[in-house]
């Protein structure tokens, strides 16, 4: 699409730019003093937030108005704040969007600490399939709270799991019945996972992508949380050498579609003979493993079992656990953050517009929120790639099947741009 040349928007003097060391400085001061500093910038090639030099400073004169944004964040006072002209481009999960097109409740991308190792993320995935849960942070802060809870008889198992998350701040409490609960500090990196799993009907939803991400550690935690094992034979006789038994895992807390997806995943990915059936007077849905599938599954998860849970293994698979906590240094990553408020900022003494040009990536962060390196003047011609507006965000959330045949998709559609805007 053809367009005329355009000068992108700017920031109010007091908007604070995030510097390379994590501190902030007012953009007006950076520009007026032509400060030779590095700022944090997102590198799309490496998918990392990196330090970059400022290579140009701009004071673009008075603005008619600024929009004041308040965005949720996990640390400090729980809020990021900045003021931008309505045409300044701000990064959202759907792409670059003009500030004037954003409303309260929309989400932008912000830099937040990323604390979990790959192993710890698997602990979360497995626990969500079992007794763990993620609850939203109710104080208008970014991040969700991961919680684990087990009865008194499983206290040792809970301690084992908590040790795997040992570098994450947490509190432990016990109720009158002796059950213990561990609440971890809210983690922004789990917010999208919480939105994907809890669809609003009270049951947990696990997509095909979720199941494909599971490692044997996650499967082991799911089994230890919700699985039962009935030992049929200890293997003392020659015909039952090695022992035999059957696994049953309760899946009542999952949506009906998820139960079928999980059964098919175990069959197709791991070659396990499993079926769904109702059990007990309450008619709860369980996944039942054949004796051959039980042995195959237990061999897969044995190296990842907690010592206190090895009674759920055949005798020949016990004593194989090799799990040790794996922690990583915190890094800054992009996560969606909700806009808590946006309004026209009252006129101040300085209404001048300020901006900077950043080496290479052409973006920077204002109080943690990603914005475009705006003073890039274009001369017309073809519309820039990032300037194309996405109006509907369509995501597949479930494949509908008739037996084994895929017959359709269940999709979630979100209007991500609802005003007339270029192009």
Curated annotation (Swiss-Prot):
Top-level taxon: Bacteria
Cellular compartment(s): Cytoplasm
Principal place of residence: cytoplasm
PTM field: This protein undergoes a protein self splicing that involves a post-translational excision of the intervening region (intein) followed by peptide ligation.
GO cellular component: cytosol
Keywords, comma-separated and alphabetical: ATP-binding, Autocatalytic cleavage, Cytoplasm, DNA damage, DNA recombination, DNA repair, DNA-binding, Nucleotide-binding, Protein splicing, SOS response
Keyword Ion transport (UniProt): no
GO process terms (BP): DNA recombination; DNA repair; intein-mediated protein splicing; SOS response
GO MF term set: ATP binding; ATP-dependent activity, acting on DNA; endonuclease activity; single-stranded DNA binding
Family: Belongs to the RecA family.
Record's function text: Can catalyze the hydrolysis of ATP in the presence of single-stranded DNA, the ATP-dependent uptake of single-stranded DNA by duplex DNA, and the ATP-dependent hybridization of homologous single-stranded DNAs. It interacts with LexA causing its activation and leading to its autocatalytic cleavage.
Name of this chain's protein: Protein RecA
Gene: recA
């Amino acid at each position: 699409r053809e367009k005329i040349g355009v000068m992108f928007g700017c920031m109010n003097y007091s908007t604070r730019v995030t510097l390379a060391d994590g501190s902030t400085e007012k953009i007006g001061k950076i520009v007026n003093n032509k400060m030779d500093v590095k700022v944090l910038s997102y590198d799309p090639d490496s998918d990392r937030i990196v330090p970059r030099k400022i290579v140009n400073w701009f004071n673009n004169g008075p603005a008619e108005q600024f929009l004041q944004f308040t965005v949720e964040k996990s640390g400090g006072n729980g809020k990021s704040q900045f003021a931008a002209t309505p045409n300044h481009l701000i990064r959202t999960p759907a792409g670059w969007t003009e500030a004037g097109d954003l409303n309260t409740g929309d989400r932008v991308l912000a830099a937040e600490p990323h604390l979990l190792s790959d192993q710890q993320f698997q602990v979360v995935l497995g626990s969500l399939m079992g007794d763990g849960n993620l609850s939203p942070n109710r104080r208008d802060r970014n991040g969700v709270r991961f919680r684990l809870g087990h009865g008194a008889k499983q206290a040792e198992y809970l301690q084992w799991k908590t040790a795997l998350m040992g570098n994450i701040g947490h509190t432990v409490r016990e109720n009158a019945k002796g059950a213990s609960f561990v609440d971890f500090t809210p983690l922004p990196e789990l917010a999208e996972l919480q939105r994907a799993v809890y669809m609003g009907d009270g049951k947990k939803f696990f997509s095909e992508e979720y199941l494909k991400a599971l490692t044997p550690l996650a499967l082991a935690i799911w089994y230890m949380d919700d699985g039962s094992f009935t030992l049929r034979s200890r293997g003392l006789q020659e015909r039952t050498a090695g022992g035999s038994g059957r696994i049953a895992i309760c899946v009542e807390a999952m949506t009906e579609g998820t139960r079928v997806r999980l059964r098919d995943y175990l069959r197709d990915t791991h070659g396990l003979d499993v079926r769904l059936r109702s059990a007990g007077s309450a008619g709860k849905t369980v996944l039942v493993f054949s004796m051959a599938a039980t042995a195959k599954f237990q061999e897969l998860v044995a190296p990842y079992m907690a010592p206190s849970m090895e009674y759920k293994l055949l005798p020949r698979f016990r004593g194989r656990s090799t799990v040790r906590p794996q922690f990583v240094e915190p890094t800054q990553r992009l996560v969606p953050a909700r806009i808590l408020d946006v309004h026209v900022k009252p006129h101040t003494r300085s209404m001048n517009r300020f901006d900077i040009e950043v080496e290479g990536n052409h973006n920077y962060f204002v109080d943690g929120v990603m914005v475009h390196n705006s003073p890039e003047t274009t001369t017309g011609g073809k519309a820039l790639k990032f300037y194309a507006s996405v109006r509907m965000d369509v995501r597949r959330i479930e494949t509908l099947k008739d037996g084994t045949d895929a017959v359709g998709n269940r999709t979630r559609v979100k209007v991500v741009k609802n005003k007339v805007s270029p192009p």
